[in-house]
Amino acid sequence: MRRLLWLVAVLATLFPSLAAAQELSLSLGEGGSISARTIQLILLITILSLAPGLAIMVTCFPFLITVLAILRQGIGLQQSPPNMLIVSLAMFLTYFIMEPVFTEAWTTGIRPMIDETVGVELALQIAIQPFRSFMAARLDPNTFHAMAALRPGGDAIALAPDAPLSILMPSFMLSEIARAFQIGFLIFLPFLIIDLVVAAVLMSMGMMMVPPATVSLPFKLAFFVIADGWSLIAGALVRSYMT
């Protein structure tokens, strides 16, 4: 109770105009009360805390982070680039790819809600529509129908942007991860060939006690740098969403 009252006091200090407004109050017993606006603020904070997870589910972030993680493992580096750098790169590439979708959602839904020309519920429905179209265009039909079949009566649900989000979102994530594994296989192949060549050379020289991964690592790094691997992979990932 004390923590709740302390939170209300802090919010009243930060938002004096809201605190001074006449609003509906709810009695908590023992002389405590909490306003409806405070409840709205608490709900807003809760939604904001879930925003990163929502961003992962409806954007290309799962695909990008999976491919980059497979790339690092294929080279043979365990901690370099560090996880924070990999995640940051995936986030900025996500922003680059998703910027048209973000702009459309802001223009058609969020901005009118801020200008109070449409209601909150309608604005959210309009804002989520660009993400629905993005997910519907990327997901695998077989995955979608397999997920829909798990729901009672879901066989009649068609693959469309207006499909239920409870089916559209997991189908999109599974499709993105499967596509990332396919690309990861292609990325892994040249590094696997280098490992096999180095292992064969070491065996022919009788150096069976030398770990092939240790010897092949400099060659894989040199191959990746000479081929300008980061630019090639980043460009290929971005272009895969432009088609």
Regions found by a protein language model. Give the residues of each.
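Hydrophobic alpha-helical segments and their helix-loop boundaries in membrane
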Residues: A20-T243
